[in-house]
Curated annotation (Swiss-Prot):
Function: Involved in oxygen transport from the lung to the various peripheral tissues.
Protein name from the UniProt record: Hemoglobin subunit alpha-1/2
Domain of life: Eukaryota
Subunit description: Heterotetramer of two alpha chains and two beta chains.
Residues passing through the membrane, by range: none
Length: 141
């Protein structure tokens, strides 16, 4: 459960990311593919080479979904319902992949904003990404 302090940390951090969210989303997705090669199986039609336009485009979609989640932090299930349906029923993404991507998002954000990435912010973002992952996998059951 996200505390009021967690919500503030997430919103403040996301505001600082600003227009770089899409760039960071692409970088995190690329990092996920490199660190966890099994995640590539969901993208057989993509050029997965470093700097790929397809990976960057999908990374922006991930970032846009997270921006929506931040904007609706008090109603993640409502905000992400359609995305949950897509991943559960159509794409059938293994739930563990959300955790792997979340980890790579944390690493990417820490690399770009080391001064802002305090232990409290790290914990808040980790809890937020976990909450988003829980919503995205809620319809698997």
């Amino acid at each position: 459960v996200l505390s009021p302090a967690d919500k503030t940390n997430v919103k403040t951090t996301w505001d600082k990311i600003g227009g770089h969210a899409g760039e960071y989303g692409g970088e995190a997705l690329e990092r996920t593919f490199m660190a966890f090669p099994t995640t590539k199986t969901y993208f057989p039609h993509f050029d997965l080479s470093p700097g790929s336009a397809q990976v960057k485009t999908h990374g922006k979609k991930v970032a846009d979904a997270l921006t929506t989640a931040v904007s609706h932090i008090d109603d993640l299930p409502g905000a992400l319902s359609a995305l949950s349906d897509l991943h559960a029923y159509k794409l059938r993404v293994d739930p563990v992949n959300f955790k792997l991507l979340s980890h790579c998002l944390l690493v990417t954000l820490a690399c770009h904003h080391p001064a802002d990435f305090t232990p409290a912010v790290h914990a808040s973002l980790d809890k937020f990404f976990s909450a988003v992952s829980t919503v995205l996998t809620s319809k698997y059951r």
